[in-house]
Swiss-Prot record:
This is Endonuclease III. Keywords: 4Fe-4S, DNA damage, DNA repair, DNA-binding, Glycosidase, Hydrolase, Iron, Iron-sulfur, Lyase, Metal-binding. It comes from the Bacteria. GO terms for biological process: base-excision repair, AP site formation. The keyword Cell inner membrane does not apply. One of its GO terms (molecular function) is DNA binding. Its EC number is 4.2.99.18. Belongs to the Nth/MutY family.
Length: 211
């Protein structure tokens, strides 16, 4: 596997920045609690399907207290179009109760505390810290796990390994948005089956590993 040198890495992020100066996540949310819920719901589901369900849900429950009052059964009625909704509903009710009991109904700005909540893993915690609190974490999803090694930004084979590589090689000035740049690039350009190399802003920089 070929990897980019530091000059090449910087050029990659310069191009991604030029193409999309202010990348945005595609999940809809209103506060850090609704962000946490939306990210939890997005596991093995599309952002579009989550947004469709949460548009109505967040009108009636956008705080831990309101979600707990809604209850698991009624929550299921809002999210039943989302994959694994019974398990996700159970976890959302449980984490709402824990947020009230342990964190004064506030979403904690701490990775360890976030990962102690029901259903919240390392990737979810990183997304919430980045999008909700402006911390330059890099959450590695399936798109980033595929795309970062293709480009030559990482030789990792697991999400944690790719995350470690990206935190090392990504220039500080690009770290805040690195997650979204690579994710969106993988979702819309460097796709799994038919990467759109001829249309790619990185075509002259990319290592094209495993393509």
């Amino acid at each position: 596997m070929r990897l980019l040198d530091s000059k090449g890495v910087h050029a990659v992020f310069e191009q991604l920045h030029a193409a999309n100066p202010q990348p945005q996540g595609e999940l809809h949310w209103r506060n850090t609690f609704t962000l946490l819920v939306a990210v939890l719901l997005s596991a093995q589901a599309t952002d579009k399907s989550v947004n469709k369900a949460t548009a109505a849900l967040f009108d009636v429950a956008d705080t831990p207290q309101a979600m707990l009052a809604l209850g698991e059964e009624r929550l299921c009625s809002y999210i039943r179009t989302i994959n694994l909704y019974p398990t996700k509903a159970r976890r959302i009710i449980a984490l709402s109760a824990e947020l009230i009991e342990r964190f004064a109904a506030q979403v904690p700005c701490d990775a360890h505390a976030l990962e102690s909540l029901p259903g919240v893993g390392h990737k979810t915690a990183n997304v919430v810290l980045n999008m909700g609190f402006g911390i330059p974490t890099i959450a590695v999803d399936t798109h980033i796990l595929r795309t970062a090694p293709r480009i030559g930004l990482s030789s990792g084979r697991t999400p944690r390994a790719v995350e470690r590589d990206l935190l090392v090689v990504t220039p500080r000035e690009f770290r805040m948005h690195a997650h979204h740049w690579i994710l969106l690039h993988g979702r819309y350009t460097c796709t799994a089956r038919r990467p759109r190399c001829t249309e790619c802003c990185l075509r002259d920089l990319c290592c094209k590993n495993n393509i």
